[in-house]
From Swiss-Prot:
Role summary: General factor that plays a role in the activation of archaeal genes transcribed by RNA polymerase. Binds specifically to the TATA box promoter element which lies close to the position of transcription initiation.
Species per Swiss-Prot/TrEMBL record: Sulfurisphaera tokodaii (strain DSM 16993 / JCM 10545 / NBRC 100140 / 7)
One Pfam family hit: TBP
PANTHER family referenced in this protein's UniProt entry, alphabetically: TATA-BOX BINDING PROTEIN
GO biological process: DNA-templated transcription initiation
SUPFAM superfamilies tied to this protein: TATA-box binding protein-like
Sequence repeats, residue ranges: 15-91, 106-182
Record's keyword annotation contains Transcription: yes
CDD domains for this protein: TBP_archaea
InterPro entries: TBP, TBP_archaea, TBP_CS, TBP_dom_sf
Family, as annotated: Belongs to the TBP family.
Protein name: TATA-box-binding protein
Gene Ontology MF terms: DNA binding; DNA-binding transcription factor activity
Amino acid sequence: MTNIPEIPYKAVVNIENIVATVTLDQNLDLYAMERSVPNVEYDPDQFPGLIFRLEAPKVTSLIFKSGKMVVTGAKSTDELIKAVKRIIKTLKRYGMNLTGKPKIQIQNIVASANLHVIVNLDKAAFLLENNMYEPEQFPGLIYRMEDPRVVLLIFSSGKMVITGAKREEEVHKAVKKIFDKLVELDCVKPFEEEELEF
């Protein structure tokens, strides 16, 4: 049995963006919205959706005449729900007759993480399955995790980007799982301040 180094898990995870679709189950008059609702943009010759920007929380919604919306920019599920409620409330305040409850479905969560370790990407590329690492093309290792089903871009600095999650818990699970796997494969070492090169 090999000696697995004792490296503490000190990862910091940040949700950067949540993209969700919202179904309103009714057709919408985007021209009426453009005339009534302030601070929206609608130019059907350029793009078929109406652009609705919120300042707090800072999200953008693309609203289509089919009653579908794409909401992007939220940093948490709670913020996403708050944004959708605020959009619906604003549309109703300006005379839009919206019936029914919106159905929200998260399509993608993008997160960043810092493992606070140095990752040996050459070794990880050799030992991990489902990965792609071509340092001449891109400095990070692309790892496709099966459970949860996410893609991780892992850098030698211990920083990473996670995409494809549908729930925030999946992001945290994926980061912990890849950390444990990298430790098990002896692909990480503690981050030392003096190792920084300027």
